[in-house]
Amino acid sequence: MLNQKIQNPNPDELMIEVDLCYELDPYELKLDEMIEAEPEPEMIEGLPASDALTPADRYLELFEHVQSEKIFPDSKTFPDCAPKMDPLDILIRYRKVRRHRDFDLRKFVENHFWLPEVYSSEYVSDPQNSLKEHIDQLWPVLTREPQDHIPWSSLLALPQSYIVPGGRFSETYYWDSYFTMLGLAESGREDLLKCMADNFAWMIENYGHIPNGNRTYYLSRSQPPVFALMVELFEEDGVRGARRYLDHLKMEYAFWMDGAESLIPNQAYRHVVRMPDGSLLNRYWDDRDTPRDESWLEDVETAKHSGRPPNEVYRDLRAGAASGWDYSSRWLRDTGRLASIRTTQFIPIDLNAFLFKLESAIANISALKGEKETEALFRQKASARRDAVNRYLWDDENGIYRDYDWRREQLALFSAAAIVPLYVGMANHEQADRLANAVRSRLLTPGGILASEYETGEQWDKPNGWAPLQWMAIQGFKMYGDDLLGDEIARNWLKTVNQFYLEQHKLIEKYHIADGVPREGGGGEYPLQDGFGWTNGVVRRLIGLYGEP
């Protein structure tokens, strides 16, 4: 099997902590000045006052009690509940009765909260449908209509209809939506594309950025910045003209670059890192450093095993969620242990490629509007970012892009994130050719490309394959003239999804693809989800290009 070639990854790329009890290594101890110079962010941007409160903010010890007692099997359930009355009244009632001998926490929750609705539980797939028919019939099932904001609910109302991924995810997600949109366009659902375009523009206008998802507990972070790719899709499909989104793109860019001008070399603030040579690169970040509402108990348990201050671990867990790769060996000091997570000290190759695309899009649209100074400024920014990426994140010896540990000043692991520079046109042809060789020998399997070559038990690692990574690899390699590799990945992935669909009559979030026998992907913090938005989107687009498998 092809995957047998990657059993022994390059030892230079491993970052395994030798002494697992000693978390503050000498590389970090020498950085006191840098850390002290990194100011704490102010209050999160977005909704002011009470509407920005998360369930953990509102319910305080009641929230912690419910989550620690595991009233619900999924930690996300309680944050998604809606209160039946003013949260303050609920909290007062709880404090009055919680010490009674006959107090029943579950009954208290059921009496004071509406549980989240499971929309897709009644949908039954028709086994006679082809894969294409199945996907087209799922769009209405995954569509949520706009509704008035439920008072004190964590759900943020949106002005237009939107698509959710499915399963436990009953809200829209930022980077998921781009890959879902690819399929909507192929299915001729321009109506939904327009709605989602309006929604994301509205979020930028109202929150200053696109949150991870439309929940209050997602406001403190974003996700991989793919709005520029969405705008490109809107333009290509004649849904919305790109010019109307120039201001939105600039606002998103300002969010990601906040604080950059005040940094000196080896300093970081929020999403921005000033490198030793003065260049600017970006990292993932979350403005909060508390356990995530939707994974509260899991985060508390992870922090207990870290040997570090809990708030640092919580920040890195949150930043990992902002990356979309939650979680992966990419963010771990010890590749087998989530408690060693250090997301904020890595400069991710995919994030900086997406920001290169954002800078290029602003330059291109500014040129269309005759704004020559803005065009020149952002072309220079894109060029500077590409130079910095080549300096710090390109491994010339192995011919691959890798994440960069900016605190240890060394390259990190190789993963499928390395294909994003090709997808956005940031690589040169020599880099693309060399990267293709590495992907063939290290990530390609009969089922598609692996997220990484490391087996850690995390979901964004071997043996799993994910739809967005397949799409970016397929299109990225074809863009640089490697049709053979792009087509092979496409056919392998379509075969994986179709074979599983014929057996199970559903599409899922991720697939086990390491051994050529398609089955459910594992790992992560929650059970495998079906639906599934971005898998549907990518597969529907590929069917349009390659036909049904």
From Swiss-Prot:
GO terms for biological process: cellular hyperosmotic response; trehalose catabolic process. Monomer. Its EC number is 3.2.1.28. Pathway: Glycan degradation; trehalose degradation; D-glucose from alpha,alpha-trehalose: step 1/1. It catalyses: alpha,alpha-trehalose + H2O = alpha-D-glucose + beta-D-glucose. Belongs to the glycosyl hydrolase 37 family. GO terms for molecular function: alpha,alpha-trehalase activity. InterPro entries: 6-hairpin_glycosidase_sf, 6hp_glycosidase-like_sf, Cyt_trehalase, Glyco_hydro_37, Glyco_hydro_37_CS. Hydrolyzes trehalose to glucose. Could be involved, in cells returning to low osmolarity conditions, in the utilization of the accumulated cytoplasmic trehalose, which was synthesized in response to high osmolarity. It is an enzyme of class 3 (hydrolase). Substrate binds at residues 168, 175-176, 212, 221-223, 292-294, 324, 525. One of its GO terms (cellular component) is cytoplasm. This is Cytoplasmic trehalase. Keywords: Cytoplasm, Glycosidase, Hydrolase. PANTHER family: CYTOPLASMIC TREHALASE, TREHALASE. It comes from Escherichia coli O81 (strain ED1a). Its main location: cytoplasm. It is found in: Cytoplasm. Transmembrane segments: none annotated.
